[in-house]
Amino acid sequence: MKRLNERSRMVTEGVARAPNRSMYYAMGYEEKDFVKPMVGVANGHSTITPCNSGLQKLADAAVEALEAAGAKAQVFGTPTVSDGIGMGTEGMKYSLVSREVIADSIEVCVNGLWQDGVVVIGGCDKNMPGGMMALARTNVPGIYVYGGTIKPGHFKGKELNIVSAFEAVGEFTSGRLSEEDLKGVEQHACPGSGSCGGMYTANTMSSSFEALGMSLPYSSTMANVDAEKVASAAESARVLVEAVKNNLRPRDIITKKSVENAVSVIMAVGGSTNAVLHFLAITSAAEIDWTIDDFERIRKQVPVIVDMKPSGTYLATDLHQAGGIPQVMKILLDGGLLHGDCITITGKTIAEVLKDVPSVPRADQKVIRTLDNPLYKQGHLAILKGNISPEGCVAKITGLKNPSITGPARVFDSEDDAMAAIMAQKIKDGDIVVIRYEGPKGGPGMREMLAPTSALVGQGLGESVGLITDGRFSGGTWGMVVGHVAPEAFVGGTIALINEGDSVTIDAHQLLIQLNVSEEEIAKRRAAWKQPKPRYTRGLLAKYASLASSASKGAVTDLNLDLT
């Protein structure tokens, strides 16, 4: 029988480890504890953001359940960045970087202390992929516990979420909203703890982790403030101890087939563009053969069957009441769009987990549809290619009145410059805004363009203006927007060669993003282009810029390292 402390005994057994044990005795350990599995609890609690401010109760529940199940819990902290608070500022450059820092910090503690398993608890966007990357890297038994969604806010009879506040800025600047109502939206959009409530990035990733098999059924759509979320954290800890006993490891669960399941669910629920970047990073960490083209392959197979914000109607709490991710998965499974034989952290297969879930969603709900009555016949996250982005870029293409647009480029070398022009109402119908030098290396950090896109929506330009960037978009973004353009401007990608007024085409049907300039002219501009000086030469952002891969490879920092 496998020893449950197979890893941790490296620091607890033998005469030579007497000093090591002394450190544990200082924290109240007893001799009998050294034969128990030592399980880390990666606790993302902080008062930086409502996404993470409700995590301590989940960590406490996990610790209690671990100890009751015969493990010894070891709690350590992981950092977070609030995308909603950093949005539109230089601070947002740290958001994607924090994904790498979170993965690194968990790897440090799990491997540095020889932990036998780990419960990862996170809330805000980058907590999710950062934690999963660490689980894939370390490959010790692990489970992901999502902190839970926020509940909707209300003002003047209207249901609100954080994107309501971003869009209200544009409504105010265009004279469509009073200052009093702007303040009202601001104060009521976020009523308590939990991650942003639509199918934005955090809820997209939590849903995908449930489909991946690394989180418990129904856990991804629970509200943070509800008692069932605490109970789910405790159950997750108990399940993790069983995984330690059975030596069930992340790479047994995270396979190409289970990633296909996860991406199928992302398409079905209308998830965030960031999921493309993050699953490229997760599969890289798990050493799975996965490329940006795999998303397009699955998009063509899987319809959108869940009506969720930002482009739809409902929030995660509504999805939970309608049957949650298991209901979505059962519909996909019955339609031959999921692999039912994939193992989950529970030890059961996907098919076994979904055995008792109804094949048809309840008639009294409107959130989840059937395959023969989808919102859209194909998925919404399309991979566009063309001379602007030969490596591929990402667009949300469903729900657009005008899936194709050709117009004059309005070129900005930073988000800040673009936002100033939008706020000054200098962007008009038919324009295509180009925001560049915001890529992994050039930004650095691929800031999310929620502030400019929301301002355009608030000004009534969401359907008539295109936006192209080598940065990212928030999960709350909608409209004719294309992100993750690769190669990025900083390395001389064609996006760096677009001039003000150039004709640019975005065609969702043809999956095309094109600069309508002759090849000879592009070659001439490329020969004249000079790489700008890096914006940072010391510190974390400089380190990230020097190590980051292309967005088409996940913008990770441990790929193709020069170790000579």
From Swiss-Prot:
InterPro entries the record matches: DHAD_IlvD/Edd, Dihydro-acid_dehy_C, DihydroxyA_deHydtase, DiOHA_6PGluconate_deHydtase_CS, ILV_EDD_C, ILV_EDD_N, IlvD/EDD_N
Q: Which residues form the active site?
A: S474 (proton acceptor)
Quote the record's cofactor note. Binds 1 [2Fe-2S] cluster per subunit. This cluster acts as a Lewis acid cofactor.
Residue sites binding [2Fe-2S] cluster per the record: C51, C124, C196
Q: Does the keyword section mention Transport?
A: no
Quote the catalytic activity from the record: (2R)-2,3-dihydroxy-3-methylbutanoate = 3-methyl-2-oxobutanoate + H2O; (2R,3R)-2,3-dihydroxy-3-methylpentanoate = (S)-3-methyl-2-oxopentanoate + H2O
| Listed PROSITE patterns | ILVD_EDD_1, ILVD_EDD_2
**A GO term (biological process) for this protein?**
L-valine biosynthetic process
Q: Which Pfam families match?
A: ILV_EDD_C (PF24877), ILVD_EDD_N (PF00920)
Query: EC no.?
Result: 4.2.1.9
- Cite the SUPFAM superfamilies for this sequence: IlvD/EDD N-terminal domain-like, LeuD/IlvD-like
* UniProt: Mg(2+) binding residues: D83, D125, K126, E448
Q: Which UniProt keywords apply?
A: 2Fe-2S, Amino-acid biosynthesis, Branched-chain amino acid biosynthesis, Iron, Iron-sulfur, Lyase, Magnesium, Metal-binding
Q: What's a single GO MF annotation on this record?
A: dihydroxy-acid dehydratase activity
What's the subunit arrangement here?
Homodimer.
Function of the protein: Functions in the biosynthesis of branched-chain amino acids. Catalyzes the dehydration of (2R,3R)-2,3-dihydroxy-3-methylpentanoate (2,3-dihydroxy-3-methylvalerate) into 2-oxo-3-methylpentanoate (2-oxo-3-methylvalerate) and of (2R)-2,3-dihydroxy-3-methylbutanoate (2,3-dihydroxyisovalerate) into 2-oxo-3-methylbutanoate (2-oxoisovalerate), the penultimate precursor to L-isoleucine and L-valine, respectively.
Similarity comment text for this entry: Belongs to the IlvD/Edd family.
HAMAP family, per the entry: IlvD
Q: Which NCBIfam families match?
A: ilvD, PRK00911.1
State what protein this is by name: Dihydroxy-acid dehydratase
Organism of origin is Polynucleobacter asymbioticus (strain DSM 18221 / CIP 109841 / QLW-P1DMWA-1)
Q: Which gene carries the instructions for this protein?
A: ilvD
